[in-house]
A protein has these predicted regions:
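Metallocofactor- and cofactor-centric catalytic cores in central/energy metabolism, strongly enriched
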Residues: 1-191
């Protein structure tokens, strides 16, 4: 289902190429990509609901496509097997783009929840998703891979701004390492 969701997101991104997106489109793209990150969601119902949200959004943007008699295929969901069955160099570069924007979506999602967004970051999701579906060679894909890194830095700055605006500037503090009697709660995390 994660591949199906990714293919639907690619179709949605391509639908926005020359059509105006709604106020909700960026959120759906970011949430959808974030949903496909390892260890974020294993619930099939949640994935199916996200796929439905993507399809509904695409129908809002392009209402005539769903009833078109002479389908062009330009906005259809992308078949992810096209990547997995591709030449190993193309598969590797497209995978770097895909996994890079998935990771970037995690940062963008958390920043968005805190009220911070960036048009450059959001627009790059559409560009990268669309490029994944194009028939491109290694020479054309490599600059996009590098651009993922550049935009990811901008996205990390966005998340830092969101966090420091919401929670203040983090600073190291001393904590007690002594063992106390009684029940306790352990809080862990990573970044």
């Amino acid at each position: 289902l994660q591949d199906e969701l990714t293919g639907a997101l690619i179709g949605l991104a391509k639908s926005c190429g020359s059509n105006p997106k709604t106020d909700n489109t960026d959120r759906i793209i970011i949430e959808g990509l974030f949903t496909t990150i390892t260890n974020v969601n294993f619930n099939n119902e949640t994935l199916k609901n996200m796929i439905d949200r993507v399809h509904k959004e695409k129908n809002i943007i392009l209402p005539d496509c769903s009833v078109c008699q002479s389908r062009c295929g330009n906005t259809d969901d992308y078949d992810m097997n096209n990547i997995w069955d591709a030449d190993e160099d193309i598969r590797s570069l497209k995978s770097l783009i895909l996994f890079g924007i998935r990771g970037m979506a995690a940062y963008a999602y958390h920043a968005m929840v805190l009220g911070c967004t960036d048009e450059t970051v959001n627009n790059f999701f559409y560009k990268a998703l669309s490029i994944i579906s194009y028939d491109m060679d290694s020479e054309q894909l490599l600059p996009v891979v590098l651009e993922v890194g550049e935009v990811n830095l901008k996205c990390m700055e966005l998340l830092d701004k969101a966090n420091t605006t919401s929670y203040g500037t983090p600073a190291p503090v001393k904590v007690s390492l002594s063992v106390e009697p009684g029940p306790f709660i352990v809080v862990t995390g990573h970044d």
